[in-house]
């Protein structure tokens, strides 16, 4: 199997979920062995930040990568689309520290990439082929994420939410570009109304609106769902994005209540062992 890049440029302008700032993003084709590389066009010298697990520096409500003192955060939705569409190499030019949130899902990014087209390159693709059981646990909160050998890419996820409106949700998908676009990419970020003010006081969620976040309270959902189990589908979207920081995965991911911290810890373990 050959490495890939985009066949043409793709661009998107929008608001950052946490920063609340307008950002213009351009996805550009890149040669083999480049990887997925952010280019901060708003900074002097246009520094590059490689989207790899070893560059993860924070997982507070989003995944952050940092290189030589320059960072980009909330990258997981974009990484998820790259992973699902099997794009190995791309320059991501961005004029702020956070990609646009779009509607809180990865669908806009996936469709932009799909419309640009995927181009094969001469070099062989380097997959992270799972050869053993790799697992990260958070025993205190009864959470874990693991990956097993499997000839393909499958994700089985159980989300556990104490709110009666959501409760326990489970989904299990064999990941292909077609299934991802239909069943996972439209799943949006979810927030509890009572948490929003606290997040904003922390400088987070400043760009979140009912156009980009699903909000619920003790009475019910404030805006309509795309899926009855949209929370667990968005969790699957996130883990696909976070694990792409290790490389394209060939294996079966199984997770219970996992978030960015556990996901990226597993990505670091995979990168160190198999990358």
Where are the predicted features?
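C-terminal regulatory domains involved in ligand/effector binding and gene-expression control
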Residues: 1-88, 93-275
């Amino acid at each position: 199997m050959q490495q890939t890049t985009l066949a043409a440029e793709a661009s998107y302008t929008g608001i950052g979920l946490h920063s609340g700032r307008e950002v213009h993003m351009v996805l550009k084709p890149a040669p083999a062995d480049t990887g997925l590389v952010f280019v901060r066009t708003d900074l002097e010298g246009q520094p590059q930040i490689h989207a790899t697990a070893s560059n993860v520096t924070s997982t507070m409500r989003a995944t952050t990568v940092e290189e030589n003192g320059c960072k980009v955060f909330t990258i997981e939705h974009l990484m998820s689309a790259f992973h699902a569409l099997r794009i190995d190499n791309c320059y991501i030019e961005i004029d702020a520290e956070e990609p646009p949130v779009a509607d809180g899902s990865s669908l806009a990014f996936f469709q932009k990439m799909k419309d640009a087209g995927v181009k094969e390159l001469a070099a062989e693709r380097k997959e992270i082929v799972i050869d053993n059981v790799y697992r990260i646990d958070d025993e205190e909160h009864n959470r874990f994420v693991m990956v097993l050998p499997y000839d393909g890419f499958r994700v089985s996820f159980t989300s556990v939410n104490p709110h009666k409106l959501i409760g326990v949700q489970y989904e299990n998908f064999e990941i292909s570009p077609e299934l991802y676009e239909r069943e996972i990419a439209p799943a949006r970020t979810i927030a509890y109304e009572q948490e929003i003010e606290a997040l904003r006081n922390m400088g987070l969620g400043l760009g979140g609106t009912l156009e980009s976040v699903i909000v619920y309270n003790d009475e019910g959902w404030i805006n309509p769902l795309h899926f009855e189990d949209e929370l667990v589908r968005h969790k699957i979207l996130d883990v696909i994005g976070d694990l792409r920081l290790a490389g394209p995965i060939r294996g079966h991911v199984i997770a219970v209540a996992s978030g960015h911290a556990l996901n990226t810890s597993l990505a670091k373990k995979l990168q160190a062992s198999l990358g």
